[in-house]
């Protein structure tokens, strides 16, 4: 089996892993519904760009 030519130190390994991050989703205020929703997606009430385009699932 192949072996690494050099031992990777903990510092080198950890510096490489510093770029693995979670990013927060972009959220915008929807003036039509008064709720926050993700950009470029249909809101939970069925609105997209201020127009009703889908039926919302109502909890009973």
Swiss-Prot record:
Biased composition regions of type Basic residues, renumbered to the chain: 1-20
GO cellular component, one term: large ribosomal subunit
GO molecular function term, any single one: structural constituent of ribosome
Top-level lineage group: Bacteria
Keywords per UniProt: Ribonucleoprotein, Ribosomal protein
Family classification: Belongs to the bacterial ribosomal protein bL32 family.
Name of the protein described by the UniProt record: Large ribosomal subunit protein bL32
Biological source species: Streptococcus agalactiae serotype V (strain ATCC BAA-611 / 2603 V/R)
Gene designation: rpmF
């Amino acid at each position: 089996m192949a072996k690494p030519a050099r031992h990777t130190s903990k510092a080198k390994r950890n510096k490489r892993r510093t770029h693995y991050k979670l990013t927060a989703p972009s959220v915008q205020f929807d003036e039509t519904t008064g709720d926050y929703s993700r950009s470029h997606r249909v809101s939970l009430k069925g609105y997209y760009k201020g127009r009703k385009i889908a039926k919302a699932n109502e909890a009973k």
